[in-house]
Design a protein with these regions (language model features):
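Helical segment within the ABC ATPase nucleotide-binding domain
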Residues: 170-182
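Catalytic Walker B motif of ABC-type/P-loop ATPase nucleotide-binding domains
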Residues: 156-159
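A short, surface-exposed alpha-helical micro-motif characterized by mixed small hydrophobic
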Residues: 196-198
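ABC ATPase NBD coupling module
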Residues: 63-77, 101, 182, 220-223
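Conserved ABC ATPase signature
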Residues: 131-135, 139
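Conserved ABC ATPase "signature" C-loop
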Residues: 208-209
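Helix-to-loop junction immediately C-terminal to a conserved catalytic motif
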Residues: 47
Length: 239
């Protein structure tokens, strides 16, 4: 069952000001904006890493001020820029992190890892014992995606996960992510409009700690909002 997420008039110092946002179960939402706009802060509030100075954050209707944050994080998949792999653990040990916390036995974990990695064009037998330092950037990020998705989390939080990769690998991983997302609720931070249009059905434009625009992805490119036009024009030039 996919999760719902809600920010209710949250503020944090000068970073966010009275931000409200609702994400419905199964919805995919991209937070887009310039660097320093407050996108990542909003994302980190959704699993309790950052606590607002005022306002409330709810996941599945439960305030994070009183929620069991450890349990919440175990059922939340998170993908960050640079993969965030444990450098001294093998590929399999990294992928098995959440299943072990959830009490899965090794046979179930191995089968799930084998199935998921095969969908990502990674042979389980070839990669399971390798260390992160022996992998390319794209391979590391594939392992990071597998670790986040192996337990089919109801909520996926993604913080510019493909930003450091070359364009070809980036597009491949975007397509892999879309294919594997299942029915999870997704909040995806990016400053790349083409990426936002690929992975999300709704785009929220964040500017200087406030929500400047919230619309369906298909409507964003036609918006007359000045900052939205800058993103559209930049994407057109890059293309």
């Amino acid at each position: 069952m996919p999760s719902s997420v809600e920010l209710q008039n949250v503020s944090l110092l000068s970073i966010l000001r009275n931000v409200s946002l609702q994400v419905a179960p199964g919805e995919s939402v991209a937070l887009i904006g310039r660097s320093g706009a407050g996108k990542t802060t909003m994302l980190r509030m959704m699993n309790g890493i950052v606590v607002p100075t005022s306002g409330n954050v709810l996941v599945d209707g439960v305030s994070l001020a009183t929620a069991d944050l450890i349990a919440l994080r175990r059922r939340t998949g998170m993908i960050i820029q640079g993969s965030g792999l444990f450098p001294h653990r093998t590929v399999y040990e990294n992928v098995a992190t959440v299943p072990r916390l959830l009490g899965w036995d090794d046979a179930k974990t191995r089968e799930a890892a084998r199935t998921l990695m095969s969908k990502m064009a990674m042979s389980f037998d070839d990669f399971k014992d390798r260390m992160p330092r022996s992998l390319s950037g794209g391979e590391q990020q594939r392992v990071g995606i597998a670790r986040a998705m192996i337990a089919n989390p109801p909520l996926m939080l993604c913080d510019e996960p493909f930003a450091a990769l070359d364009p070809i690998v980036r597009r491949e991983l975007q397509e892999t992510f879309i294919k594997l997302r299942s029915d999870a609720t997704i909040v995806f931070v990016t400053h790349d409009l083409p990426e936002a249009l690929r992975v999300a059905e709704r785009i929220v434009l964040v500017d200087r700690g406030e929500i400047a625009l919230d619309c369906a992805a298909r409507d964003f490119v036609a918006s007359s909002h000045p900052l939205a036009r800058q993103f559209v024009d930049s994407a057109t030039v890059a293309a």
